[in-house]
From Swiss-Prot:
Pathway terms, separated by semicolons: Cofactor biosynthesis; (R)-pantothenate biosynthesis; (R)-pantoate from 3-methyl-2-oxobutanoate: step 1/2
Record's protein name: 3-methyl-2-oxobutanoate hydroxymethyltransferase
InterPro entries for this protein: Pantoate_hydroxy_MeTrfase, Pyrv/PenolPyrv_kinase-like_dom, Pyrv_kinase-like_dom_sf
Cofactor(s), names only, from the UniProt record: Mg(2+)
Keywords: Cytoplasm, Magnesium, Metal-binding, Pantothenate biosynthesis, Transferase
GO cellular component: cytoplasm
PANTHER family: 3-METHYL-2-OXOBUTANOATE HYDROXYMETHYLTRANSFERASE
Family assignment from sequence similarity: Belongs to the PanB family.
Species assigned in the record: Bacteroides fragilis (strain ATCC 25285 / DSM 2151 / CCUG 4856 / JCM 11019 / LMG 10263 / NCTC 9343 / Onslow / VPI 2553 / EN-2)
EC number(s) on file: 2.1.2.11
Cofactor comment text: Binds 1 Mg(2+) ion per subunit.
Any single GO BP term: pantothenate biosynthetic process
Amino acid sequence: MAGYISDDTRKVTTHRLIEMKQRGEKISMLTSYDYTMAQIVDGAGIDVILVGDSASNVMAGNVTTLPITLDQMIYHGKSVVRGVKRAMVVVDMPFGSYQGNEMEGLASAIRIMKESHADALKLEGGEEIIDTVKRILSAGIPVMGHLGLMPQSINKYGTYTVRAKDDAEAEKLIRDAHLLEEAGCFGLVLEKIPAALASRVASELTIPVIGIGAGGDVDGQVLVIQDMLGMNNGFRPRFLRRYADLYTVMTDAISHYVSDVKNCDFPNEKEQY
């Protein structure tokens, strides 16, 4: 199946993302956590690579995103940046690195930027973290917001169900979205909210709105790379489209290798020195 490969090799920046929204060009975004995957994703033409705290789940096997540390996020960020030439690299600030006072948040943000060489950071929350967002922005660090389902708040809500289905929560989300834009955020992720609400937010904001489980009437889409490649065999949420079945492909390849080793078929004469 033929895919889309951009012939534009210029580095993606916050300014270019806003230009893409203005001309109606959708923004593509995927997660990556290591050098090899980042090279592949960047070479395939992705616009934004998110070094997500979802590494806690898909790389470390944790049930939630909460355990991943600042040092671990910096490690993953460094690994991804080394493999990228064109895409913008955004790193998630992990739980506990910015929810305290704003100066602690700024110190965490500066560490990530200095040590990983990422292009921007992403934070979950609205009004409750707006002072921290402003403080980080005042240091010249680009910030992307994240509203709707916020995995770092799983213990508050107790479930990963769709958020902002009632009027009160929807209105708060809209207010928070405007607060984040007014503070200076260059973009916003909306996760697992009604499509009509996401469409309204995208139409009201001048900054790009990227959806995950938020319908198609937004400015772009983001998915976890392991999910869209079909590497997590039992994970099939409604919003996910699987573009490959790598779980089966990889299992078959490894099984074939095991068989060849057991049967002394590998290495053969041509595979020796």
